Amino acid sequence: MAQYPGFVYGSNEQQSPWADCERTVNWYPEPTQSSASPHVASLYPCPGQEEYVTVADINGRALFAMADRCFAVMGEHVYKVLDTNAASIVTNGTVTNDPNPASIASNGDAGGELLIGSGTNAYLLTIATNTLSASIGALAGKCTMVGMIDGYFLSFDSAASKFYISALNNGASWDATQYAQRSIAP
């Protein structure tokens, strides 16, 4: 078998990739202690994930944390993940389950809401009551991803190259004239 000097060892990234661009990801080198060994080191995998909570649904699609709270979209349910290694399904409603990632945004303490984008639909979760709305009608089929800026929710529609803007600190109010669209390719 051909010898590859320096093939097994850790990262040695330099500022310039021309100098050295070795990078080891999720593995660590363990030097061989014996001087008689033909190998200088061995690569071993880094310790992986630890199970934090178990839920009935599969396909973790989004995870969002704010103000000592954590929410997750798993399959068609929205879960509130607790710091006691437990999770509970938000009391009512489901979201569209598709193979794509979901997205979650918050309008902070002023609005107390989470906007969840899942399967081209948008859903509003009122944090104080753990109430999940049905799909927001104005955004039905128009929500690829969600975001927030300065208290305004944003809904991105990749099919139409548009983004929609909610009312200030109110994810339930969407004016159909409040959108922007790219008009020409760069």
Report the location of each language-model feature.
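N-terminal beta-propeller domains
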Residues: M1-A87, K142-P186
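Beta-hairpin (beta-strand-turn-beta-strand) motif
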Residues: G117-N121, I127, S158
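Local beta-strand/beta-hairpin segments that build beta-sheet-rich folds
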Residues: S88-G93, S133-G137
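Short coil/turn segments at the loop-to-beta-strand junctions that recur within blades
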Residues: G93-P99, A138-C143
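General structural concept
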Residues: I58-A62, M66-A67, T96-S106
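Asp-box/WD-like beta-propeller blade repeats and closely related beta-sheet repeat scaffolds
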Residues: I127-G151
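Short secondary-structure capping/junction motifs at helix and strand boundaries
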Residues: Y123-I136, F163-I165, A172-A176
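Elongated alpha-helical scaffolds
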Residues: D98-A122
